[in-house]
Amino acid sequence: MAKKIYLSPAAHGTDNPTKCPTKCGENVHCNAYMDIVEKRLKELGFEVKRGDKSKTGNTALQSRVAEANNWKADLYYVAHTNASGGRYSMTMCWNDKASLEKANVFHKYRKCVASHKVVTRADLYEIKHTAMPCMYDELFFHDNAEDCKWFHNGGMEKLAEETVQALCEILGATYKAPNTTDSKVNELEAKVKALQSENDSLKKTINVLTAKINSAKAALQ
């Protein structure tokens, strides 16, 4: 029977700005990263569910955890990027032996970054309230321009594949590397989706500004 993985990319109520080479946000590039992870997991035979992108903030956290618990997922995987000036990758989990063993598998495969650490947390909603083990990644620091450039120029794909390797080992599945053509297609698809998300955000901003302009014009008449 296929193992079940629930995916939860960043879903902040107000997306966090980044120093990425193109206009981006934490929610945007974490979803692009999770597109790659999701596709690869399905290729390898996992059952996958993913948090609804239309929901953000506490509503997203609560609905995702409830959905994963009701589905009886085998593992809950979160992907965020960090801020505050560091330069490392981090996997967080509940402070118990089983969770730490799984987080250390992430540590084993996290080779594309200079530094990675495992940290226990008891205060994060998704770690605290999931019925299954939760692995909560802070992939890199999005307030570091150099690391942002790396992530958007091949680093995203490397991190995603290392995550897939770790999840295969944790859940006892056979890992198979993607062929080169598929990897390039994944990379291009992720970039297209990121640009589409940016375009949607710009359209919303334009609509808001247009409404304000029309309101101001009406007041002058």
Language model regions located:
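Active-site-adjacent mobile loop/cap segments within catalytic or ligand-binding domains
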Residues: 6-9, 14-17, 69-71, 75-82, ...
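Active-site histidine-acidic residue metal-binding/catalytic motifs
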Residues: 1-63, 71
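Soluble non-cytosolic domains of exported or imported proteins
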Residues: 24-32, 58-62, 97-100, 150-158, ...
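Acidic, low-complexity intrinsically disordered segments
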Residues: 173-197
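A short, glycine/acidic-enriched catalytic loop
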Residues: 14-25, 82-109
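Long, well-ordered alpha-helical scaffolding segments within enzyme catalytic domains
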Residues: 32-43, 98-114, 148-177
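Catalytic cores of processing enzymes, dominated by hydrolases/peptidases
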Residues: 95-141, 205
